[in-house]
Amino acid sequence: MSLEERPKTIALLSGGLDSATATAIAIEQGHNVIGLSFDYGQRHKRELEAAKLLANHLKLIEHHIIDINLSTWGGSSLTDLNESIPKTGVLPGVIPNTYVPGRNTVFIAIGLSLAEARNAKQLVLGINAMDYSGYPDCRPDYLDEFQKLANLASKAGREGNGIKLLAPLIHWNKIQIVQEALRLDIPIDLTWSCYNGDTEECGLCDSCRIRNEALQSVRSLNNSKTH
């Protein structure tokens, strides 16, 4: 199959490890991937630089960064500098203040618009088990219901060619994601997961902690296999 004949996929590429891995999976499956990132007023804009580097490394056929400033009304520690980033870990049954109201709903809607305009058949997201333990818009039932909406709300869907919402990591934990990223030769050092907006990762926020613990666990597993 020539490059032009490959099916197109839109990938929501934040610049983090999860979205990079989901994007690489789509590429491995033979898709021409268009990356879609968002400048939504997040304090950690450093992730957008990571998204650019990853888009170049993965040789995406297009990469769009959309400006949609959700910090105008805040409601999250990621978009409101007056709120503190939590460092206490993910508490069962509690939605953390890093949840951004409506973020994924907005992102997926824009992704579906781009997919339909580009005649792409899939929209790939990096949401996973660690995400949906805390965030309502990362859960399997949310994705299932949004798929129904996508089929109803688009020309492609009404004509029976609906755009599929895919979350290949949906049931994976962070260790599994790190292992897959390594298998796919993703340069993990190019990715950015920290919630804080500094030039260096803080190592203290929940995102840093979960990522670093997974990296350490995978290193330990790999070391044990070599001895």
UniProtKB/Swiss-Prot annotation:
Gene3D superfamilies listed in its UniProt record: HUPs
EC number: 6.3.4.20
GO MF annotations, alphabetized: ATP binding; ligase activity, forming carbon-nitrogen bonds; zinc ion binding
This protein's record includes keyword ATP-binding: yes
Keywords recorded for this protein, A-Z: ATP-binding, Ligase, Metal-binding, Nucleotide-binding, Queuosine biosynthesis, Zinc
Pfam family for this entry, one: QueC
Reaction equations catalysed: 7-carboxy-7-deazaguanine + NH4(+) + ATP = 7-cyano-7-deazaguanine + ADP + phosphate + H2O + H(+)
UniProt xrefs under CDD domains: QueC-like
Binding-site list for ATP: L13, S14, G15, G16, L17, D18, S19, A20, T21, A22, T23
Pathway: Purine metabolism; 7-cyano-7-deazaguanine biosynthesis
Highest taxon of source: Bacteria
Entry similarity comment: Belongs to the QueC family.
HAMAP family in UniProt: QueC
Reported function: Catalyzes the ATP-dependent conversion of 7-carboxy-7-deazaguanine (CDG) to 7-cyano-7-deazaguanine (preQ(0)).
Protein name in the entry: 7-cyano-7-deazaguanine synthase
Source organism of this protein record: Prochlorococcus marinus (strain SARG / CCMP1375 / SS120)
Lineage: Bacteria, Bacillati, Cyanobacteriota, Cyanophyceae, Synechococcales
Gene name in the database record: queC
